[in-house]
């Protein structure tokens, strides 16, 4: 769910806002797989992105496993988050983290992935840092840490199936009704 929403958000920033974007996956191989299976399919299946991709389906310097450069000049990078070198030399407006809980907490003793990645948006007029993941072990989970450090706390409210009153989703254990 989150990954598909993230692709929609990145597509919006590429087509409507002309913003350079950088998406981090936990590893280089995960980033390559993501580019092949998700990004290329999205570009192929979304008409406005396909129109910005004259290189689609062929070898071209603007069509690599780490970068998609669109005819509008906008760039989209997808890199692994395990190597410190991947957090350098990119100036973007949007940085995204997919499966943040699977990242190492310290990247080659240079800092956390979000600390290093968010440096890429420091010069942007409209900086965006987007983070998401399936939560893992409480107390050591990076998405939990990111949520706790966030200036914003949002909940998704749904109507109670019995009385209709709005309530937020709270997950419990087997004994929770």
Spans of model-derived segments:
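Phosphate/NTP-binding elements of NTP-utilizing enzymes
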Residues: 1-177
């Amino acid at each position: 769910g989150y990954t598909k929403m993230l692709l929609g958000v990145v597509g919006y920033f590429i087509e409507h806002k002309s913003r350079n974007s950088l998406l981090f996956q936990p590893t280089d191989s995960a980033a390559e797989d993501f580019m092949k299976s998700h990004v290329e399919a999205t570009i192929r299946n979304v008409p406005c992105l396909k129109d910005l991709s004259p290189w689609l389906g062929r070898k071209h310097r603007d069509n690599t496993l780490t970068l998609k450069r669109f005819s509008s000049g906008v760039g989209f990078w997808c890199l692994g988050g395990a190597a410190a070198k991947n957090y350098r030399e990119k100036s973007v407006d949007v940085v995204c983290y997919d499966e943040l809980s699977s990242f190492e907490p310290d990247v080659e003793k240079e800092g956390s992935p979000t600390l290093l990645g968010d440096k890429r948006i420091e010069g942007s007029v409209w900086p965006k840092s987007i983070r998401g993941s399936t939560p893992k072990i409480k107390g050591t989970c990076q998405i939990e840490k990111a949520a706790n450090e966030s200036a914003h706390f949002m909940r998704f409210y749904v109507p109670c199936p019995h009385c209709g009153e709005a309530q937020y989703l709270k997950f419990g254990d087997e004994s929770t009704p």
